[in-house]
């Protein structure tokens, strides 16, 4: 999906917050995230404030999925989401309803290359991992990106550009992530660097 519409976000915030000074502060925070090309969209998702704001923004969608579509198994992180169901035809029908709601209410568009209907046994790609009923593996692209970042951090440490503490924090972060998937071989590879 495209980035959040800042005007819509402020409108949603005003539904919950009556204090104009606080709204003014939030507008300044939101507008500070906008790109120079387009001041109407964008929140950097690594920012803690953004994580809260994207959840507020997407709450309308969560409620739509839960109460209007009556989806029983739905997961969302920021603007990535999955809907699980036993009925392929029903899922196909929901795509149009989801697309229309997102466009009408939140001015968001589904990315056409990121809509999949597949069996759970073939793996559900979500948040950098491919999830199976009994295990999960790191997506190949995620794995490559992770090792590139580790190599860059290691290079920076060897050249005195970062402290050993920073290197260790990165390694521990990746090792923690790998505990949640079949990453034993990758853990050994990282420990061998």
Regions found by a protein language model. Give the residues of each.
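Conserved polymerase palm-domain catalytic core
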Residues: 1-78, 82-100, 105, 109-118, ...
């Amino acid at each position: 999906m495209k980035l959040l519409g800042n005007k819509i976000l402020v409108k949603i915030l005003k539904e919950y917050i009556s204090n104009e000074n606080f709204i003014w502060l939030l507008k300044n925070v939101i507008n500070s995230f906008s790109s120079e090309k387009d001041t109407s969209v964008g929140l950097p998702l690594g920012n803690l404030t953004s994580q809260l704001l994207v959840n507020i923004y997407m709450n309308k969608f969560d409620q739509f999925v839960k109460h209007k579509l009556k989806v029983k198994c739905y997961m969302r992180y920021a603007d990535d989401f999955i809907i699980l169901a036993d009925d392929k035809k029903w899922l196909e029908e929901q795509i149009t309803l989801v697309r229309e709601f997102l466009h009408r209410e939140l001015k968001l568009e589904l990315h056409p290359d990121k809509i999949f209907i597949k069996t759970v046994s073939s793996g559900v790609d979500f948040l950098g991992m491919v999830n199976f009923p009994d295990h999960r593996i790191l997506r190949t692209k995620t794995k490559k990106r992770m090792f590139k970042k580790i190599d860059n951090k290691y290079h920076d440490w060897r050249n005195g550009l970062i402290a050993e503490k920073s290197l260790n924090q990165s390694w521990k972060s990746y090792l923690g992530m790998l505990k949640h998937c079949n990453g034993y071989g990758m853990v050994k590879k990282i420990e061998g660097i």
